[in-house]
Each structure stands twice: as C-alpha cells, then as structure tokens.
C-alpha cells in the first residue's frame, strides 16, 4: 500500500509507547532504508493531523527511525483502539515531519520519543505520505460504478482513512481514495467500502476538485449520520464477457461477510431453474464482475441445483465461509433484465472521473431527486447495469446534442454568417422565459421564431486534446470581431459534447470572463488554449430557444432528438410519488436539448416514453428507458394544471392583493411542504388582521407569487424567506378555485388537484386497494388497517403549523395562540408546515422544531382552568419536541385544526385520504384535555435474546397499509418478544441502532434476520393499544414471518 510498510529487522525492541527501536541498517538493508526515507516528489503528499489526548494517556502509535536509526521517523504501528488508530487520519508507513512545529529531521530516535511523551494534550503532526495511484488506465474491461453508503459517525470519524485530493500542482492531483478501512469501524461494519474506493460526495456535497484538507473538514462537519457517494472499479473478466457456455466462478470472501446476491426461480423450457435475482452494489460479487442478474446457477460448491429448492440453495450459499465455487450459465447481454441492482452507475473508463478537478460540473444535485446517469456506457456494454438512481442525490451529466446538426435548435438549419445573424442578437443578451411574447422574439435560422438566452458552461479538458470545441468568426483571424464567435464544430466524446450544454451555432460571449466580441478570433482561440493548460474554462454562451406553443393543460406529445450517451437534460423526481401517480419533471437543464425546444417546463408530468406507459414504472426503470432511446424520443406529457398560469381551463381565477403592513403583521398563516410542486396555501387568518380586513384573502387560497416572484417549483422554506424579506409592501398573487368549495376539503390540500381531475383512468388506478401493489414478499402483510381507532401516530409526519407569537400587535391573547387553535380551520395535508409572518420575523426556522408554546403574557379571558390546560398542553408538546417526535406533533395539530379526532389510517400523499364524516368524533376542550394531557406516545427500548430452540425472537412484523413503517404483527406466547413486553401494533423505530422509521418490511426483515442472538429495538406504542384485545387483521392469505 505505502512505501513505509516494510519489515523490521529481527531483534528490535519496543522501548516505550512511542518507540520502535531498530539496529542500524547494513549490507542489503541499505537500499531498503533508502526507500524508506524518500518518497519521490511527484508522489509525495503532505497533511496535518491534530490529536487531542487525555492527560496521562498515549497516542497509541509506534514511531521508528531517527538520525541514529534506519531512516526518517515514520509510523510503524498503530495500536488497535488507540487514539491515533481511531482518529482515522494516520496510516502505517506515514512519515512524521514535525511535532507541534518542531522538525524531526535532525533528531535521534530517543529524542523523538521524549518529545512525543512531553508534548502535552494537543498534538499536531505534519505527516508525509505517498499519494494514491492516479486515474485508472483506459481499459474497456474496467468499468466504474457508484454506490451510496450511509454511515454513522464514531467519535469524529467514519472508520476509514482518506488520502489524495486536488493539488496546486496538477501532477499531484488525485482522487480522494480510501487507503485503509479500520477493522470494526463504522465503514467495516457496514461492509460496502473497500480500500481503493474513491469518495465522490458527502451528504450531497460534491468533492471533485476538493483538496485533502477540504475533504477532511467536510467529514468533520458531518452530522451523526452521513451519506457517502463512492466510486469503485469492476473488472469484467474476458472469459465472462466472451462466454458462450457454462463457467466455473470462484469467489473469495471475508469470513462472516455476505456475498451480496439474492436468488430467485424462473422458468426455462417449462422447467424451474435458479437464477441470480439481484446483486448488492459494492458487494464481493458485484466487485468481481463475474456474475450478473439473470445468470443461471448450475451448481454451488459441486452441489447440483437441478433438484434443489430456492430455500435450499440460499441456505447452501449462506453456509459457505471463505471460498465459493459457482457453476453458472451466463445470461446473454441482450437478455439481461432491464432493472439494475439498486444504485449502480456505469461509466466508460476512458472518460474523466468525477473526483478529477477537471470534470465538468454544471449543476448541483437536489436531495430527493433522481437525475440521469452520470456517465455514458461503452458501445456494446450491458445496458441493464448502467443505471444510476438513488433516493437521495445523484449527480447530473449534461450531454450534447448531435454535432451533425449545426443549429442551436434541434432539427434546425445551418447557421448563417456571424455578420448577418449576430448583430441583432447582441443587445438582447438576457434571460427570457419560453413564454415570452413575439415582441421579444426573433427569426432564427430556418425561419423559426426563437428568443435568445444565455448560460454559463464549465468545461474541463487537458492541454493535449483541449475541450473539443472549435470557433468560427470573422474573415481573418486578426480581424476585430463585431459579433461573438460561433461554435462551428464539437468533437465527438469530448468535454464540450459530454457537458450537454453546447451545440453547433451557439455564440460564445466570453471566455473566462473576457468578452470575445471586442477581440479577434486569434485571441479567442488563444484564450481557449491557455484555459486548456489550466484544465478548465468558463464560457458564457448565447443560444436560441424555440417559441413553441405551450398547452396550458391537457396531454400532448413532445419529440426530442437523442444521441447515445447524451442525455436530454431533464430531471425526474419521485420523492413523494405513490404507485399509479405519474413521474414529475422537476428540473430542465438550461441549454439542454429539452430546454431549447421551449415546450417542457418543470412540473410537467411524464406519462410515457416511446409509448411505454410509466403509470406503475419505478423511476429507475424510467431513467433506464430514457438511456436506451436513440435518435428520437417521444415523450407523453401532461401539464401540471395546478401550477399553470392559465386558469381558464381549471375553473379558477387569479388576482393580485397588495398589503401595506406599516410595521405590523400581515395576519396570515401559510402552509405547504418542502416538495417543490406541492401547493402553498393560506391556512389561517388572524381575526381582524390586515389580510382578513381586505376581504380578498381567504383560508384555502393558493399563493402563486410573492412580490412578483413566482412560487412555482419552490418549497415552503423559500416562500417563508420571500415573506421575511418582503418589506413594508407585500404583493400576493392569489389563486381561488371557483367550482369547488372554499372551505377546507377533508381530503387534503385545497389547491392541489388530484390525478382524478385530469385523467379518470389514472384516478381509478390510484384508488385501487393497496394490496394490489403489495410487494411479493410472503412474510410481509399489513397491520395499520387495524389502527383505525387511533388519533395520532408516532413517527409519521402529519400536518403542522408554525405561528410565532412575539410580534402580533393589536390582537387579543386568544389570537396570539398558535394559528391552528383559532376558529378558522386551515386545510390539512400530510407533512405540511405552516408559517405566520410577523414584523419582527428575522430568523424563523422553516420547521416547527423551536415553536414557542408559552402562554400569553397578558391575562387571557376565560376560566383559569383553560389557561392551565394550555400551559400543561404546551409543556407536553415541548416534551415531544425534545424526544424527537416533531412529526407526531404535527399530527396532533391536524386533529385540533379540524376540531376532530380522526379515526382513519394516515396516508402520506394528499388527495387520497378517506376522511369520512361517519368516522369523526367531535372533541370538546375537556375531551381534548383528557386525550392530550397524558403522554400520547410511549417509547420503549426492548432487548430480546433469540430462542435457542426455535432460532427466532418470537414475533412477526408487517407493513403499514398506507404509509411506510414496520409494525409488530403477532407475538408468540411465551416467546422472547412476549417475555420482553412486545405487543401487537408496536411500531419499530430502531433495530440495533439503525433507524427504521421510514423502512418497509422489505428493508427491515433482512436487518432483523442479521441481528444475531441479541436484538435491541426501540418501539413506539400508543397507551390505549396496550388494553386492546383485537388482533391485527391480515390483509391477505400470506402469513407473517416469525422472526
């Protein structure tokens, strides 16, 4: 691994906690000592390590070397469990250059040891190490994949040593490579990360171009749990790639680790055979590159699978400790399944890597959105393994449109001379919406009506091949340009093509901030050559966008040109999507093919791709279908009528209201979610407040814009920010639905139309029983259906409000209570947050986790008992906040906002919740006091020991019917779970310190199965369920699996 990893001469004595003595090298050891004391400059990296030790303790490292020993001082051993080892900042073989600023070059071994012993509590080591290897060589048999790994911090580290990073000297720039995974650490326990993996991002923060110090600082700033995106290499053996018959595959794994494959049975020639169903990303099997989903398993360690059942094959595979020999029949590449295994991304090895500081990055990923795959797949590569999709954040690659089409518009004509086409465009270099009037449009090439937009493009290249971009302008190279130069050619598979934002015919307005119009063509080309030496260039580009006719509603088709390995530029979102609901286009890359058509907008719903319907298609499959399209892609689009500015067809009116606050509050409470296209509505009005006195604003009205800033595609937090900085005059654009009641609906948000309003067929599909979409796992069933008598649920995100009380001027104490306690019932919607702006609102949080529940300072009217109730109620809510039950808090608020205690199961998506009048119970304040003053939720930590006879824990789990969640279904009498106090309907929030609040049984059952002999659970329980004698109802014939 590192140069310092070399043997010590026999007979060396350990002179102390820091000492590693050694005899002077002689004879054959001289060359070894020379190698130890010098790392070539081009492979040398420097880092600073800071360690804080307790008084009387040691660092836990052994130092060898010194002027009287065999070379420079270096780390020869790290004591397991010691401070240095747990810091994950040092490797064996690292050279120590200085300690607290004192250089060790001229110190003897004993002097170094004395220095370390007396250095004090704070130790700063300057460390020299060998840089990790550079980018992998171009090899068509090596592909790079990425995987998202969630790790829990242990101390200040995650259990791995990170080296490399960007450097001022380009020759020393390296990827951020894991050079050591500490045994027993968080990364080792999780099992996915291996030495040599490259770190791409942490919690969505990209690290390409980051130095080693920056990367370490990012890791230190992470919270207790962090999401790492890691790249790893997979080498496909030639024998597998060219296989035409059965193969024998031998895989060596660490004892105790899992292979990472799951088996299934399929039918082949009317005979049941065992095949590979899925391969876990970054597992031993995945990294081997020898096995693929769909491969037919002929034998396992010499045992034929011809007459084995699936269960027997799975047990046989799990019983093998170190070396596994599988005889397989590889599935043909053309028959490999469309669905890949989890979050895996395939790239061409000859392309630039994301850790390289020269890789183009034109867009920041959004959490919760799936973007298109980052890299292209080589010709002939298996497409079933080239998909990237994660529920967190995946980076976007911007590909280019076909360079054979020289227009900036898809299917356009040849560009004219810059002298005849650029003169009239220069003065219009500003951003436009694609819905601009014809007054701001021009006639582009081919007679098409267009308007111009500008964007900034960052390209990364190298001095040899440059950026793959050629410019054209003027007649002579030394002639002063009267208009910007044109992009006249884009080299295939170059950075200019891969970025996806450039097309032939685009005008380059500036290069690295230097305008091109006042210079010469030679100067522009020189700027590009100089930028290539620095590996990076920033271009300001002007391009044409078609003035297309955009339907305000309804369904239509869009045809886009598509080139293999070049994406369309659309981002698909499914953060809150349920089965049967369409995918949403959440973002369109400016300058991409999709953007230049002028037809697509964020918020559009994607119904089909090339006539393949996406009703029940997972987002990963939709991305894969887009990737496999070539030449021409036909998209079926439905406009988002709720977000449409054209309101005639939606039965709604919009108008603008101007409010002058004069230092006072607006008197409104807004409600919404952090989903970009969920509506933001007015959920409460202060009695006799400014907004209510206008008579133009009502509860349930939807806010379309604040001070002329559209809220389309913006979450609630941005709307809150706009109100905070709005000033004295606030202009609200309001949308009011006329053909629907203005009072809050029982089914969710007032202003969000369900799919049933737009597509009756989709509505029928959306209303089917949940069992129709139940996963094919025999041990999973639903228990939430039996919870219909509960009013709240721990751990679910329900409706909520945030109503700061501090600055409500001119109102009674009753009005200064939280907005959901007032008379006007605002609309309720799962996971919604409300916000009431006030004149003193400077830094209100976006969520309700710091709500002020203190009673009013002035005396409140009414009996003292009511005031005491609200004080006790506020204290109870504060207790819920402190124990992490803010989402339960929102659910409690929902019940009081509507004045009812709901008896229906909760559903995470608005528009489908079956609120029925017959299932409501009116609640008086006295009843609510009785309901809410006792603890509404019990939290229990349960430790169970596996039954040695039955090898289980004596309980089964089931899914939530309408929400994600894992619940205890049945408890076996006298079993471990029964003796431990577990009860049916308990919700499992943690399993062995892993949060399962948002899991379903597909994720939780393997976690429970791998728990070993001791299982630690944190469960939530409603007090009244402890006395319920009803057994949970099974939704289907399948029986739950006993764990």
UniProtKB/Swiss-Prot annotation:
Residues 384-397 have a biased composition (Low complexity). Residues 48-131, 148-234, 248-332, 456-545, 557-641, 656-738, 941-1023 form the PDZ domain. GO terms for cellular component: cytosol; glutamatergic synapse; plasma membrane. Residues 422-432 have a biased composition (Basic residues). Its main location: cytoplasm. PROSITE patterns: PDZ. One of its GO terms (biological process) is neurotransmitter receptor transport, endosome to postsynaptic membrane. The keyword Lipid metabolism does not apply. CDD domains: PDZ1_GRIP1-2-like, PDZ2_GRIP1-2-like, PDZ3_GRIP1-2-like, PDZ4_GRIP1-2-like, PDZ5_GRIP1-2-like, PDZ6_GRIP1-2-like, PDZ7_GRIP1-2-like. It is found in: Cytoplasm; Membrane. The modification Phosphoserine is found at residue 38. Residues 399-420 have a biased composition (Polar residues). Residues 843-854 have a biased composition (Acidic residues). Gene3D superfamilies: 2.30.42.10. It holds the Pfam family PDZ_6. Residues 1-26, 373-448, 743-866, 1023-1043 are annotated as: Disordered. Residues 1034-1043 have a biased composition (Pro residues). Keywords: Cytoplasm, Membrane, Phosphoprotein, Repeat. It is a peripheral membrane protein. May play a role as a localized scaffold for the assembly of a multiprotein signaling complex and as mediator of the trafficking of its binding partners at specific subcellular location in neurons. PDZ 5 mediates the C-terminal binding of GRIA2 and GRIA3. PDZ 6 mediates interaction with the PDZ recognition motif of EFNB1. PDZ 7 mediates interaction with CSPG4. Belongs to the GRIP2 family. Interacts with EFNB1, EFNB3, GRIA2, GRIA3, CSPG4 and GRIPAP1. Can form homomultimers and heteromultimers with GRIP1. Interacts with the C-terminal tail of PRLHR. This is Glutamate receptor-interacting protein 2. It comes from Homo sapiens (Human). The lineage of its organism: Eukaryota, Metazoa, Chordata, Craniata, Vertebrata.
């Amino acid at each position: 691994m590192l140069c310092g990893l070399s043997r010590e001469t026999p007979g060396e004595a350990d002179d102390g906690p820091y000492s590693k003595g050694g005899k002077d090298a002689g004879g054959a050891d001289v060359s070894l000592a020379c190698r130890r004391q010098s790392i070539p400059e081009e492979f040398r990296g420097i880092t600073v390590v800071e360690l804080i030790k307790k008084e009387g303790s040691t660092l836990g490292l052994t130092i060898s070397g010194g002027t009287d020993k065999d070379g420079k001082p270096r780390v020869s051993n790290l004591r397991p469990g010691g401070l240095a080892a747990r810091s994950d900042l040092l490797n064996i073989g690292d050279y120590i250059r200085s300690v607290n600023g004192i250089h060790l070059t001229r110190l003897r071994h004993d002097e170094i040891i004395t220095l370390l012993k007396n250095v004090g509590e704070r130790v700063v080591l300057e460390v020299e190490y060998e840089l990790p290897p550079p980018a992998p060589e171009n090899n068509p048999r090596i592909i790079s994949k990425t995987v998202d790994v969630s790790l829990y911090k242990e101390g200040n580290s995650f259990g791995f040593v990170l080296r490399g990073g960007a450097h001022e000297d380009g020759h020393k720039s390296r990827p951020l490579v894991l050079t050591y995974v500490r045994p027993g650490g968080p990364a080792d326990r999780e099992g996915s990360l291996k030495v040599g993996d490259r770190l791409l991002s942490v919690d969505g923060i990209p690290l390409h171009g980051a130095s080693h110090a920056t990367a370490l600082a990012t890791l230190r700033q992470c919270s207790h749990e962090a999401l790492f995106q890691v790249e790893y290499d997979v080498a496909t053996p030639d024998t597998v790639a060219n296989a035409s018959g059965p193969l024998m595959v031998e895989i060596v794994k660490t004892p105790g680790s899992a292979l990472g494959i799951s088996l299934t049975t399929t039918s082949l020639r009317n005979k049941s055979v065992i095949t590979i169903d899925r391969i876990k990303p970054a597992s031993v099997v995945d990294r081997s590159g020898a096995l693929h989903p769909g491969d037919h398993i002929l034998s396992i360690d010499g045992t034929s699978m011809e007459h084995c059942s699936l269960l027997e094959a799975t047990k046989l595979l799990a019983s093998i400790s170190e070396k596994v020999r599988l005889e397989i029949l590889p599935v043909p590449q053309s028959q490999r399944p469309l669905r890949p295994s989890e979050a895996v991304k395939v790239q061409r090895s000859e392309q630039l890597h994301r850790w390289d500081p020269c890789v183009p990055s034109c867009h920041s990923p959004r959490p919760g959105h799936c973007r298109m795959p980052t890299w292209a797949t080589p010709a002939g590569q298996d497409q079933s393994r080239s998909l990237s999709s994660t529920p967190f954040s995946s980076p976007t690659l911007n590909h280019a449109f076909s360079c054979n089409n020289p227009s900036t518009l898809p299917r356009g004509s040849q560009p004219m001379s810059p002298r005849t086409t650029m003169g009239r465009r220069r003065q219009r270099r500003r951003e436009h919406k694609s819905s601009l009037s014809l007054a701001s449009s021009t006639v582009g090439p081919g007679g098409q009506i267009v308007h111009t937009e500008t964007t900034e493009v960052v390209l990364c290249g190298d001095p040899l091949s440059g950026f793959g971009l050629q410019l054209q302008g003027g007649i002579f190279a030394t002639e002063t340009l009267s208009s910007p130069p044109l992009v006249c050619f884009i080299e295939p598979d170059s950075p200019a093509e891969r970025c996806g934002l450039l097309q032939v015919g685009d005008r380059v307005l500036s290069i690295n901030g230097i305008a091109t119009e006042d210079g010469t063509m030679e100067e522009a080309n020189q700027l590009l050559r100089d930028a290539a030496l620095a590996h990076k260039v920033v271009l300001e580009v002007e391009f044409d966008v078609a003035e297309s006719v955009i339907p305000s509603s309804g369904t239509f088709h869009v045809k886009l040109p598509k080139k293999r390995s070049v994406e369309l530029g659309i981002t698909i979102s499914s953060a809150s999507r349920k089965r049967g609901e369409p995918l949403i286009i959440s973002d369109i890359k400016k300058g991409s093919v999709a953007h230049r058509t002028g037809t697509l907008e964020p918020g559009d719903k994607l119904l089909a791709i090339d006539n393949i319907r996406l009703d029940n298609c997972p987002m990963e499959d939709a991305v894969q279908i887009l990737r496999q399209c070539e030449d021409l892609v036909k998209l079926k689009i439905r406009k988002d009528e709720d977000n449409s500015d054209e309101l005639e067809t939606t039965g709604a009116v919009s108008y603008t209201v101007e409010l002058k606050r004069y230092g006072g509050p607006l008197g409104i409470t807004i409600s919404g979610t952090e989903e970009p296209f969920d509506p933001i509505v007015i959920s409460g009005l202060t009695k006799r407040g400014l907004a209510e006195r206008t008579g133009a604003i009502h509860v349930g009205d939807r806010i379309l814009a604040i001070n002329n800033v559209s809220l389309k595609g913006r979450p609630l937090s941005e709307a809150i920010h706009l109100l905070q900085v709005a000033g004295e005059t606030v202009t609200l654009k309001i949308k009011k639905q006329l053909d629907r009641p203005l009072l809050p609906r029982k089914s969710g948000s007032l202003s969000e139309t369900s799919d049933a309003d737009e597509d009756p067929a989709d509505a029928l599909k959306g209303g089917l029983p949940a069992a129709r979409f139940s996963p094919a796992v025999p041990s999973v069933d639903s228990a939430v259906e039996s919870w219909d008598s509960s009013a709240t649920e721990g751990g679910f995100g329900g409706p909520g409000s945030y109503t700061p009380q501090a600055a409500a001027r001119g109102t009674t104490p009753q009005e200064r209570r939280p907005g959901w306690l007032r008379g006007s019932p605002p609309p309720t919607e799962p996971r919604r947050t409300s916000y009431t702006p006030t004149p003193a609102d400077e830094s209100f949080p976006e969520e309700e986790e710091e709500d002020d529940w203190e009673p009013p300072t002035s005396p409140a009217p009414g009996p003292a008992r009511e005031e005491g109730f609200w004080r006790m109620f506020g204290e109870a809510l504060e207790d819920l906040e402190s124990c992490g039950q803010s989402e339960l808090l929102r659910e409690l608020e929902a019940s009081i906002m509507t004045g009812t205690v709901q008896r229906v199961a909760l559903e995470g998506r608005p528009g489908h919740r079956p609120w029925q009048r017959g299932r409501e119970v009116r609640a008086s304040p006295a009843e609510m006091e009785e309901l809410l003053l006792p603890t509404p939720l019990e939290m229990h930590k349960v430790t169970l020991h596996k039954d040695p006879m039955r090898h289980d824990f004596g309980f089964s789990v089931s899914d939530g019917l309408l929400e994600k969640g894992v619940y205890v279904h049945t408890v076996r009498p006298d079993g471990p779970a029964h003796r431990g106090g577990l009860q049916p309907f308990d919700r499992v929030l943690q399993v062995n310190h892993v949060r399962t609040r948002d899991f379903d049984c597909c994720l939780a059952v393997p976690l429970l199965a791998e728990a070993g002999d001791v299982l630690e659970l944190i469960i939530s329980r409603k007090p009244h369920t402890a006395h319920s004698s009803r057994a949970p109802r099974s939704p289907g014939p399948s029986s739950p699996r006993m764990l």
